[in-house]
Amino acid sequence: MAGILTKIFGDGNQKQLKRLEKQVDLIEQLEPEMEKLEDIDFKNKTEEFKTRYKNGESLNDLLIEVYALVREASKRVLGMRPFRTQLLGAIALHEGNISEMKTGEGKTLASTMPAYLNALTDEGVHIITVNDYLAERDAKDNGLLFDFLGITVGFNHNGLSKDEKREAYLADITYGTNNEFGFDYLRDNMVLYKEQMVQRPLNFAIIDEVDSILIDEARTPLIISGSAKKSAALYQQADGFVRTLNKENDYTYDEKTKGVQLTEEGINKAENYFSIENLFDLDHVSLTHHINQALKAHVSMHRDTDYMVEEDEVVIIDQFTGRKMKGRRYSDGLHQAIEAKEGLQIQNESMTLASITFQNYFRMYNKLSGMTGTAKTEEEEFRNIYNMDVIAIPTNLPIAREDRADLIYKSMEGKFRAVVENIKERYENGQPVLVGTVAVETSELISKLLKRAGVKHEVLNAKNHFREADIIEHAGQRGSVTIATNMAGRGTDIKLGDGVKELGGLAVIGTERHESRRIDNQLRGRSGRQGDPGISQFFLSMEDELMRRFGSDNLKSMMERLGMDDSQPIESKMVSRAVESAQKRVEGNNFDARKTILSYDDVLREQREIIYKQRFEVIDDNSDLREIIENMIQSSIERVVATHTQDSDEENWNLEAIIEYSNGNLFDPDTIHTDDLKDKEANEITELLMKKVKEKYDAKEQELTPEQFREFEKVILLRTVDSKWMDHIDQMDQLRQGIHLRAYGQNDPLREYQMEGFSMFEEMVANIEDEVAKYIMKAQIRENLQRQEVVKNTQAVSGGEDSGKKKTKKPVVKSNTVKRNDPCPCGSGKKYKNCHGQ
């Protein structure tokens, strides 16, 4: 059916490529002209392009000339002439799309053209990679090219000071990891002084390995957290209790959803163990939560698959890359439950101070593009969520790799035996082999079996990823055998050594299907780069997780009926189709989960944007805060007056409450009396109180210099907004955790979350207004001239292994220097030199 439709309407990808091909022809026509340029002319051309852009020409108008210039510069500086296919990919990137370019097709070089073109606007270009090694390598290599063209390059990484970061962001093109860019955005919105901000407005980003960042890590929020004080004892008690349970009677485990819950017998055991009557009483909410997390830690979280223990710490393993995610912690107490399970010291739960998902961070850029070898399977998601088309760029040379059908064995033991035999045979012939595994423990098991078989090999998994680039670089040499977990080592080419092509190229062996077809395709794609020969094949067993979760029981019983032993595999199209449809189902489920998370995160995104915008107004030196603060005080007064003057009969108005509020929160005692408010309308009461507020405000302003009083206003606003916002994030997180229970009451959880989230936000805004009113009118000015962070020690935590280092925020604090003849800040009225300046 799809084939018929393609014939009638044409293939969308082919149409796009035809359009791009016409532009590539025009670029190629300019090659002779560009070859005539002297080296010195290239920098002059850059200035010429910038002037033309400022004079009204668009980047699209300049594209043909610009790409021809960069191509010529690349020939001279790097000794590489971009192929036509790289030009196709480069145009697609400029248009804000995803270029699907296979491994070894030169994505890095293709990215230099749109990066240079968009840098001409002087608004900055960010090139984002999955790790610091790749970012630094590309910044250094491509930096030579950009320097030749008169364009500056920055490398943004974890170890930089604020000033160095600011410098990196001020460069025309900035390289760095997704984590670092996201954290800088959050940290910029926690600074106390505008001068401490490092990022410019987000203009254009090119994301390398875009599927890894926008799909695999889309559900991973970037979090800046501070520690919350909670007792470790309850985790240990819950852990002790869970150890007494047996899986036959006390709990159920759903392997598909990884959900664990107590049975009726388990609940009775819990009530007896903790000497309580009803586990589900409101008084025991915390206990129930701790028991659930302990259950999850013991039943669904597996050591060396989901996490590993290193230096007495629980380190999460990324399920997609197999890398260690140092510094990242499971939320909601699960990490502490695993620490209790492993007998480690339980660390404090953290309180979220600021967070954002990659989905929402990258959607803030004016234009976004990306490149990867595997994106077509997630085309719908890229289009729906990021408004990006996936354009599959043809390879420069035809793919010569042979992708063989899957071999399915009855048991894991039989599968691994066959894998080792296959590797040994190839090893003895000198053919290099890359073995892909899904879990760390599988890579270690195969390593053990290969040692026994006398096969020399390298292992690349979460435990030794620091040697990643080195191991991958040598994986194509004669006689080399490399075991890699989940295609760690993306971004580094496997080049074939001498004589390897004659042996059939690199052999890729998959030991298990991943739940995502894309990850399987990435593994296959390591072989057969740039027209090289190669083979790929997956060895599966009926005991593999994907086969267990979605495979057919009929198949296993058929193998048994036929009397097939472990040495006889099935090579069946039917099984391969069943595996693929299982993968499609999982991908669909994961897409739905990411869409749901985005819908929930959008609620917080809107609120975050409002707060961050207001916060920027506070730290921006040009803003008039008095007007903002007076509006806040007026809102606070109007709320109080409205609450106590609702009755249509004025006799029933509670004027005493208004007086108590006014004298307690705004003025000195006995400032407002009943006679002041009697016989006045509600709006007249508000007007009277606001008149008094302005009088007191004027008087307070006289106590200090205008600069010092503006600083006092900023101190109060920042402290109030930050503390209330952080509490609000925490409350929204708790609301999010429990909202799914509303589905039992036939309510849409998302709709409920939106409504409750909105009312909680309004309540937070009211609390901010009330507190600002109180502090501005009642606080002692001299004690409030130093801006302070609400939480001292903060830590940036995310799904990437590069962000694990603790970062203690040390703001550059401006000192408010008081001149000798200024009024003393203590409020005495004397000159500083005659008071505290002696």
Swiss-Prot record:
A single Pfam family it belongs to is SecA_SW
Q: Where is this region: Disordered?
A: 793-838
Spell out the subcellular localization from the entry.
Cell membrane; Cytoplasm
The record's NCBIfam families line, in alphabetical order, gives: PRK09200.1 (NF006630), PRK12904.1 (NF009538), secA (TIGR00963)
| CC cofactor | Zn(2+)
Q: Name one GO molecular function term.
A: metal ion binding
Name of the top EC class for this enzyme: translocase
Q: What's the source species for this entry?
A: Oceanobacillus iheyensis (strain DSM 14371 / CIP 107618 / JCM 11309 / KCTC 3954 / HTE831)
**Which InterPro entries does UniProt cross-reference here?**
Helicase_ATP-bd (IPR014001), Helicase_C-like (IPR001650), P-loop_NTPase (IPR027417), SEC_C_motif (IPR004027), SecA (IPR000185), SecA_CS (IPR020937), SecA_DEAD (IPR011115), SecA_motor_DEAD (IPR014018)
What is the phylogenetic placement of the source species in the record? Answer: Bacteria, Bacillati, Bacillota, Bacilli, Bacillales
Q: What HAMAP family does this protein map onto? A: SecA
| Keyword line | ATP-binding, Cell membrane, Cytoplasm, Membrane, Metal-binding, Nucleotide-binding, Protein transport, Translocase, Translocation, Transport, Zinc
Complex and partners: Monomer and homodimer. Part of the essential Sec protein translocation apparatus which comprises SecA, SecYEG and auxiliary proteins SecDF. Other proteins may also be involved.
Cofactor annotation remark: May bind 1 zinc ion per subunit.
PANTHER family reported for this sequence: CHLOROPLAST PROTEIN-TRANSPORTING ATPASE, SECA INNER MEMBRANE COMPONENT OF SEC PROTEIN SECRETION SYSTEM
Q: A biological process (GO) annotation for this entry?
A: protein transport by the Sec complex
Annotated catalysed reactions = ATP + H2O + cellular proteinSide 1 = ADP + phosphate + cellular proteinSide 2
**Name the record gives this protein:** Protein translocase subunit SecA
